[in-house]
UniProtKB/Swiss-Prot annotation:
Chief location bin: membrane
Organism from which the protein derives: Baumannia cicadellinicola subsp. Homalodisca coagulata
Name of protein: ATP synthase subunit beta
Quaternary state and interactors: F-type ATPases have 2 components, CF(1) - the catalytic core - and CF(0) - the membrane proton channel. CF(1) has five subunits: alpha(3), beta(3), gamma(1), delta(1), epsilon(1). CF(0) has three main subunits: a(1), b(2) and c(9-12). The alpha and beta chains form an alternating ring which encloses part of the gamma chain. CF(1) is attached to CF(0) by a central stalk formed by the gamma and epsilon chains, while a peripheral stalk is formed by the delta and b chains.
Listed GO CC annotations: plasma membrane; proton-transporting ATP synthase complex
Record InterPro entries: AAA+_ATPase, ATP-synt_VA_C, ATP_synth_F1_bsu, ATPase_a/bsu_AS, ATPase_alpha/beta_chains, ATPase_F1/V1/A1_a/bsu_N, ATPase_F1/V1/A1_a/bsu_N_sf, ATPase_F1/V1/A1_a/bsu_nucl-bd
Its biological purpose: Produces ATP from ADP in the presence of a proton gradient across the membrane. The catalytic sites are hosted primarily by the beta subunits.
Amino acid sequence: MTTGKIIQVIGAVVDVEFPQNIVPKVYNALEVTNGKNKLILEVEQQLGSGIVRCIAMGVSEGLRRGLTVIDLGHAIKVPVGKSTLSRIMNVLGEPIDMKGIINAEEHWSIHRSAPRYEELALSQEILETGIKVIDLMCPLVKGGKAGLFGGAGVGKTVNMMELIRNIAIEHAGYSVFTGVGERTREGNDFYHEMKDSNVLDKVSLVYGQMNEPPGNRFRVALTGLTIAEKFRDEGHDVLLFIDNIYRYTLAGAEVSALLGRMPSAVGYQPTLSEEMGLLQERITSTKYGSITSIQAVYVPADDLTDPAPATTFSHLDATIVLSRQIASLGIYPAIDPLESTSRQLDPLVVGQKHYDVALGVQGILQRYQELKDIIAILGIDELSEDDKMVVSRARKIQRFLSQPFFVAEVFTGSQGKYVSLQETISGFEDIINGKYDHLPEQKFYMIGSINEAMTKE
């Protein structure tokens, strides 16, 4: 093994000098022992004269010039396979759940190529989530990618936890949850939620939390993806959840600044599109198995044109947009049915009936949106009878789009509801056709299927 020595330490950036004829490759893992602690560095740049610039995959506290560094001769490798299920790991694949070591038969490099074109496989099979607004307005497809876009505090993590809970119980495959730069408290809550739902034995958890150095947060998404790729290549249908893809971008911006690159628009790294592409192109389905990915995307200052969410948009099949305005009305999940889109909302994929009902719902809500200004100025009494009916049905639809969640039971006191796709379509179809025009709109708030509106107090 080649050895070198540290010549400079600036925060998370460490420069290491090696003999000029055996300089480590970019992305190689280096190991430095500091007392009892071992720290992994990842080579990011070769500066010439045998010097490489590295990012520390951990706290660089205590490092000093002159310490010996060993080149491991390969990129960071993490355990993969069934031994990772029900375990919590860090960016290096080390267990952080105090349940002992992970006895994996294989370790894979976190830097891998995307599958070749001839290996790819497309699926048109709809993935039922049990959440009405998603299943109707922005359906997800098996092997597709969906993004949950929203500002701070509108419910991205709660929606993601509900999706994991519903799909993991209904769907027999494995799930990988990757916490990228999120709160430790949320990671802890998520673990206990999965344990209480009895789905922990089908989930691998990989965390790189908010308090960790930028190198950990930047690479942890690749660690989770590598574990998911192994399950896919074994022939499984895998669910990959990433919370939050914005923190991945932010960690990349921190690393870029530390490496001395010139920032681009709004202070992001100049390599933003490339880094996003490297991650997203690997999240795909092959003829062996599928990876279905659901990613939470924080939207800074609720601005969807910010480079970070805007770069993510182009990689997704479905965009689920969470709205602060809808959350302020007390309608949860606060998903905007007019802003949210899906490539699968096509009669050839979802069927003509589903497509017609979704378009009917969109049409009524869009008309209600247009009438709001008139109502605010002149009052609802000045509207024509047809428009009054549109407003009445739109308000019922708006309330029927709300739904009690299983993962929020402890906060709301309402039992969670799973609504099948067929029940969702027939419920909205009945509202559009005027079957429930005689019922007050309050009856449609926070219920599961449409039948509950008849019995609700």
